[in-house]
Amino acid sequence: MSQVTKRALEQSLKNLLLKKPLTKITVGDIADDCGINRMTFYYHFKDIYDLVEWSCLEDAKRALDEKKTYETWQQGLLQIFEAVQENKPFILNVYRCVHREQVEKYLRPLVDRLLLDVIDEEAGGMTIRAEDKQFVAQVYSYIFIGLMLDWIKDDMREDPRQIVDRLARMIKGSMAAALLRFKL
């Protein structure tokens, strides 16, 4: 029942974002739209931004599913772009109402989930310290998130496939090369 309520709250927030900016939406608005009381909202989330973050993480889980290997990372990243695009009014509203850093905070778990699995696979039989793997993941995460934030800022006009294809061409082989440099 808890997941059902959370999904209903998420849908209410997304409905409200079609009508007004995030900064003008209250917990009461969401509760009214959802047909629950405010305390039920607070049972599940500490504030609206907590709901936004949860929504982004849930979208990431659905988008990535099993697309977290070296062979499928492009498909996984494309699915993140597509999930963001499917929620365009929601994402653009959040992007315009909060600082870029906040949107980055929402995107980071999506991208990190993808990258860490890919890096673990690429590291294969290599002995590499965990903090070095994390560092490599962080560098790629900045690239991926930076591209996505610029795409969002530009109103998601460019075809995500082109972005992912160009990125794949540019970084092909670089992750394995970076990991080799950290090999013990």
Please provide the spans of the model-predicted regions.
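An amphipathic alpha-helix adjacent to DNA-recognition modules
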Residues: Q3-K6, E10-K14, L18, T23-V27, ...
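Short, hydrophobic secondary-structure boundary micro-motifs
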Residues: I25-T26, L92-V94, V103, P160
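Residues in the helix-turn-helix
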Residues: T40, F90
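Secondary-structure edge/capping motif, primarily at the C-terminal ends of alpha-helices
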Residues: K67, I91-Y95, E122-G125, W151-D155, ...
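Amphipathic alpha-helical segments that line or abut small-molecule/effector binding pockets
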Residues: Q74-P89, Q138, Y142, G146, ...
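Amphipathic alpha-helical packing segments from all-alpha helical-bundle domains
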Residues: R100-G125, E131-G146, A176
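Protein-protein interaction and targeting regions used for scaffolding, dimerization, and localization
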Residues: L116-D117, T127-F135, K153, P160-I163, ...
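C-terminal peripheral helix-coil segments that are non-catalytic and often amphipathic
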Residues: D150-L184
